[in-house]
A protein has these predicted regions:
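Acidic, serine/threonine- and proline-rich intrinsically disordered appendage/tail regions
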Residues: 152, 171-194
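Asparagine-centered strand-capping/turn motif at beta-strand->loop junctions
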Residues: 75-82
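Short, solvent-exposed loop/turn segments enriched in Ser/Thr/Gly
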Residues: 67-74, 154-159
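Low-complexity, acidic Ser/Thr/Pro/Gly-rich terminal tails and inter-domain linkers that flank the onset
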Residues: 44-67
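Short, surface-exposed ligand- or partner-binding patches at beta-edge/loop junctions that are enriched
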Residues: 139, 147-171
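Short Pro-Gly-centered flexible turn/kink motifs
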Residues: 130-144
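Extracellular mucin-like PTS domains
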Residues: 25-46
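The feature marks short-to-medium sequence segments in extracytoplasmic or secretory-pathway proteins
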Residues: 88-133
Length: 194
């Protein structure tokens, strides 16, 4: 009887330690998340002619249409900080799942000599041009992906897109109404900013 009570006490102590340690891990994760929030919300006034940063913008995902397994959409970025900045080229995209894990992406910048697709918006099919954006101005880019799996490929569910405007720059986060499911190793066709 005494041995049974001792084993029961050890078991209850183990359960209590396990339960408390799980809560401590969750608390650490929450603290880590809130630490990154102030960094992404910092904005500064920029003199004219400097490169745009993701932190200068608010993003909106524009649901598109699909045809023959190819889904088309666009993203509108609105400059929310004072001053003006310049932008030229293609966005750098990162896809995340519902837990925030980064998903594989295989971007193809269009237009290119390698062919590819034509976006429904004619501006998206033009080469990159230099854009100067003041507070309240908008810029867009188009994207497309196949939602039809081939062979043994997986179609991941991306619920968040981080858009980086320049290499090493900050990002703006965009959340689509419906998850993106790019198949074929995360192949996403991307237009330049227009």
């Amino acid at each position: 009887m005494r041995r049974t009570l001792t084993l029961l006490g050890v078991f209850l102590a183990f359960v209590a330690i396990f339960t408390l340690s799980r809560h401590a891990t969750t608390s650490t994760t929450t603290t880590s998340s809130s630490t990154t929030t102030p960094t992404s919300s910092t904005t500064t006034t920029k003199p004219a002619g400097t490169g745009c940063l993701g932190s200068d913008f608010r993003g909106q995902f524009n649901q598109g249409q699909g045809a023959a397994g190819t889904i088309y959409a666009s993203v509108t970025l609105t400059k929310s900080s004072a001053g003006s900045c310049t932008l030229k080229g293609w966005p750098r995209l990162t896809l995340q799942d519902k837990l925030g894990a980064q998903l594989p992406i295989n971007p193809a910048n269009l237009p290119s000599s390698a062919g590819g697709i034509q976006f429904p918006t004619s501006q998206a099919n033009q080469p990159p041009s230099l854009l100067t954006l003041a507070k309240g101005a908008t810029t867009n880019f188009s994207l497309a992906y196949s939602d039809v799996p081939t062979a043994n490929s997986v179609c991941d569910n991306a619920v968040t897109i981080s858009v980086q405007l320049s290499v090493g720059g900050s990002t703006v986060t965009v959340t689509p109404l419906f998850a993106l499911q790019p198949c074929n190793n995360g192949r996403v066709w991307v237009s330049p900013f227009y």
